């Protein structure tokens, strides 16, 4: 996966909704691993391929790279410019498809129509949308300064389903004030919406964020690795077996990460998850509660 920065901003940053952003979001707009926004999409992809070359060898003639439009809100801005960036990635012979990180309140009919056209132009490439939900609970949304009510997420999900555009939902484990029950309610709600995929992300405390101020003031407990794995196994067991699990952890940039430091060892986290799932004899979907799909 090649993380890209195409110079977008966010309504939570540019004054449309706020200027401070979500309380956990870094100055890089959650795109701290992306290449420089001063580079073209093609140059960023080439740089990513070079960085990945030590652990990834593309099969000749077979596209296998995901172009991940990650930094800030990648459907927010000039439509022609956005579509041009998407198309530049889709036209790369090494790119299998694109994944576009955005907010549910930034999916206008115009941008969706543009994505429809690209799906027709590039039928052999996939186009995914990644929605930053974080929590289904509006009280949590207010606490983290998300900037939109959960009803907007449901509307966006319905629009994407109607246009057959696959989407992935981001949820964060360890948000301020959230309980295990809150988190499992978010999982159940996502099951009902039934996206193509889900990313489960550990809450990182990064330098320069309002979350860091809460942590440094002693007002924010941070999950231990054991607590995180306990929550994570519960989430995976409750998640529909038909939903693709794209991420189960994350590693914040070393130069910015304040806590939890244990998250820097992704291998330890993954090994711990495998061991705990095996110990508890759990698989994805074992505790899934089928219900009426939101999209029906």
Which residues fall in each region the model found?
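Auxiliary Fe-S-binding modules of radical SAM enzymes
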Residues: 197, 205-296
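Alpha-helix N-cap and loop-to-helix initiation/capping positions
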Residues: 40, 77, 81, 144-152, ...
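Surface-exposed amphipathic alpha-helices with a cationic face
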Residues: 49, 53, 115-123, 157-162, ...
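Distinct, well-ordered alpha-helical segments
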Residues: 79-87, 108-119, 183
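Structural recognition of alpha->loop->beta junctions
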Residues: 22, 88-95, 185-199, 269-284
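Canonical Radical SAM [4Fe-4S] cluster-binding loop centered on the CxxxCxxC motif
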Residues: 1-43
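Core AdoMet radical
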Residues: 28-48, 52, 56-79, 94-107, ...
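Conserved C-terminal portion of the radical SAM core fold
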Residues: 151-210, 226-249
């Amino acid at each position: 996966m090649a993380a890209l920065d195409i110079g977008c901003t966010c309504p939570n940053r540019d004054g449309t909704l706020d200027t401070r952003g979500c309380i956990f979001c870094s100055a890089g707009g959650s795109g701290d691993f992306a290449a420089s926004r001063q580079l073209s999409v093609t140059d960023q992809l080439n740089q990513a391929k070079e960085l990945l070359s030590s652990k990834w060898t593309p099969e000749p003639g077979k596209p296998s790279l995901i172009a991940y439009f990650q930094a800030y809100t990648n459907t927010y801005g000039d439509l022609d410019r956005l579509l041009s960036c998407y198309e530049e990635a889709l036209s790369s012979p090494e790119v299998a498809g694109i994944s576009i990180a955005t907010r549910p309140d930034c999916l206008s009919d115009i941008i969706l129509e543009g994505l429809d056209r690209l799906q027709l132009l590039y039928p052999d490439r996939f186009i995914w949308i990644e929605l930053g939900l974080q929590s289904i609970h509006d009280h949590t949304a207010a606490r983290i300064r998300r900037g939109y009510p959960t009803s907007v997420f449901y509307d966006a999900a319905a629009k994407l389903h109607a246009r057959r555009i696959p989407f992935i939902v981001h949820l964060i484990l360890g948000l301020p004030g959230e309980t295990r029950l809150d988190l499992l309610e978010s999982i159940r709600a996502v099951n009902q919406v039934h996206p193509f995929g889900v990313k489960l992300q550990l809450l990182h405390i990064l330098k320069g964020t309002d979350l860091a101020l809460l942590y440094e003031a002693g007002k924010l407990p941070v999950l231990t690795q054991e607590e995180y794995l306990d929550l994570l196994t519960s989430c995976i067991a409750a998640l529909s077996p038909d939903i693709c699990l794209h991420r189960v952890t994350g590693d914040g940039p070393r130069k910015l990460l304040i806590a939890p430091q244990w998250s820097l060892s992704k291998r330890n986290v993954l090994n711990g998850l495998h061991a705990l799932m095996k110990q508890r004899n759990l698989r994805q979907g074992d505790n899934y509660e089928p219900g009426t799909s939101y999209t029906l």
